[in-house]
Amino acid sequence: VGGVKDLATHDGDLTAWGAGSNYVSVSAVTAYRSGRENEDMVNVVGKLENGVLVNNLVNWLCPFKDRKTIVIGEKGALVADTLMGDLTFYRNGSLPVEWTQVANFRGVSEGEVTRYELAKREPLRVEHEHFRDAILGKGSEHVSMSEALQALKVTEEILKSAKQR
């Protein structure tokens, strides 16, 4: 498999879950730079049913690991660093910017930053525990079959779109 099925599947699923809305369209381009049979980079632009616009860049090429999902809303930006398990909210600034040239160039200013304290557990262990609980009929933190199917459909649409380019 390539970067789309390995990584973009999770990004798309996280995006849909976080926004509470499914994808209605995707457009993607891929790159093959490392000599592998499958793609090692994909850039996806998408739109969700609720009108949210999505941009995912996923790759195996970057020499450093960067796995962030950024949601920009009317009050600020929520950044989920899925590699480190960090969640940070950057509130839009409320103070007027007195320097006109900077205000025109920058747009929204940065206000308070809140970094949420989260328990950091080993992801594969958590995944296995949830799988066990699903088999035993315990708990409620399971992905439904329809959610899993939707994630796979989006993944296939990404690959289909990329082939058309």
Predicted regions and their residues:
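Phosphate/oxyanion-binding loops and surfaces in catalytic or ligand/nucleic-acid-binding neighborhoods
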Residues: 18-21, 74-78, 158-161
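C-terminal glycine/acidic-rich active-site capping loop/insertion
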Residues: 74-146
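Rossmann-like dinucleotide-binding domain that binds NAD(P)(H)
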Residues: 1-64, 70, 84, 146
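C-terminal helix-rich "cap/oligomerization" subdomain common to oxidoreductases
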Residues: 49, 130-165
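Short alpha-helix boundary/capping motifs
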Residues: 43-44, 99, 159-162
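A general structural signal for well-ordered alpha-helical segments in protein cores
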Residues: 11-15, 125-129, 155-156
